[in-house]
């Protein structure tokens, strides 16, 4: 974000709860909030020069996020107010997904959570995707480091191949090997 304190204030205006107040952290200024539906979100403004030389694209970088939420429309409005994101709905046949964009570029999808209390998508939360060059190698390495891979590697037509993982602490992350021209799930 351009201004962590201002984004934090806008989030509070829309019903967010502060987890960590805006704080300097050596690389910039950050805060962590919980949105009105309970999903945690970090806000960060890099210090001048802190990200010089960093290319946030390619192997090992976060390339996409999904927000699982009880109300994608309300969440899109919250993100528009706090982050300035825009959103559009995309018909996926059996369901509709909301695609959020920053600066005209798609950055996240917003999904309606599952209403089954036993389903892991019952809780509102962000689900990050990390780009990898070779998904079989990255998946094997994750397993070696103690990750649980709950299902087989799966294709996402027109996007690439992905592998959901749970690290040894239970944190969910997806590995994504994008197709040549993919820009997000």
Where are the language model's segments positioned?
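Short helix-capping and inter-helix turn/linker motifs at the boundaries of alpha-helical repeat units
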Residues: 21, 55-56, 119
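Short glycine-enriched loop/turn motifs at secondary-structure junctions
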Residues: 25, 58-61, 121-125, 157
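Vicinal oxygen chelate
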Residues: 1-37, 72-73, 128-172
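Conserved short beta-strand elements that form part of the metal-binding/catalytic scaffold
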Residues: 36-47, 86-123, 167-168, 172-179
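N-terminal beta-strand motif that seeds the catalytic metal site of vicinal oxygen chelate
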Residues: 44-77, 82-85, 125-128, 176-185
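Long, histidine/aromatic-enriched segments associated with O2/redox biology
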Residues: 81, 100-104, 108, 112-114, ...
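Core segments of cupin and vicinal oxygen chelate
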Residues: 13, 21-28, 32, 67-107, ...
């Amino acid at each position: 974000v351009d201004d962590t304190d201002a984004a934090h204030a806008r989030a509070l205006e829309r019903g967010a709860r502060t987890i960590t107040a805006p704080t300097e952290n050596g690389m910039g200024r950050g805060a962590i909030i919980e949105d009105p539906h309970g999903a945690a979100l970090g806000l960060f403004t890099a210090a001048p020069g802190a990200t010089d030389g960093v290319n946030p694209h390619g192997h090992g970088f976060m390339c996409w996020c999904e927000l699982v939420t009880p109300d994608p429309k309300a969440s899109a409005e919250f993100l528009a107010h706090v982050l300035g994101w825009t959103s559009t709905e995309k018909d996926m046949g059996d369901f509709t997904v909301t695609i959020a964009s920053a600066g005209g570029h798609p950055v996240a999808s917003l999904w309606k959570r599952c209403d089954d209390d036993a389903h892991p998508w019952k809780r509102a939360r962000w689900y990050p995707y990390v780009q990898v060059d070779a998904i079989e190698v990255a998946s094997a390495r994750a397993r070696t480091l103690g990750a649980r891979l709950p299902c087989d590697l799966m294709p996402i037509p027109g996007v690439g191949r992905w592998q959901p993982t749970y690290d040894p602490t239970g944190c969910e992350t997806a590995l994504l090997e994008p197709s040549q021209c993919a820009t997000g799930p």
